[in-house]
């Protein structure tokens, strides 16, 4: 049997050491169709603060405060079954599908065009 001995380790952190500048695009986030993130979160046409696109202005203001510079969409487990073709075209013609990741019905009311509009509203390029 191998013998184990205790080893000593030392970690030195130099907060003045810089490898290089960090690009602004590193500080991002993602939007996933989980729970209330999209529907009744960022998109709720009947909400008192909703704009002409159905985006909640109170949420837009909070997202701006975060300072995110990029958003990955769709994000999380939702992307595993996402069909981008379902989220384009007239909303009333978009198919409803079972979201296999979260076992819910995806209406595709919020798709790629809506995401692009929402990003513009938040100032995230």
Predicted features along the sequence, with ranges:
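Non-catalytic accessory regions flanking glycosidase/transglycosidase catalytic cores in CAZymes
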Residues: 1-125
């Amino acid at each position: 049997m191998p013998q184990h001995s205790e080893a000593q380790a030392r970690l030195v952190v130099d907060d003045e050491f810089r490898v290089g500048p960090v690009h602004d695009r590193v500080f991002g986030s993602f939007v996933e169709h989980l729970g209330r993130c999209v529907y009744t979160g960022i998109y709720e046409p009947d909400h008192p603060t909703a704009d002409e696109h159905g985006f909640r202005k109170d949420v837009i203001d909070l997202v701006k405060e975060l300072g995110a510079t990029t958003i990955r969409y769709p994000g999380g487990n939702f992307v595993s079954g996402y069909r981008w073709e379902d989220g384009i075209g007239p909303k009333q013609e978009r198919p409803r599908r079972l979201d296999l990741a979260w076992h819910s019905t995806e209406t595709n009311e919020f798709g790629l065009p809506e995401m692009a509009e929402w990003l513009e509203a938040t100032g995230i390029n």
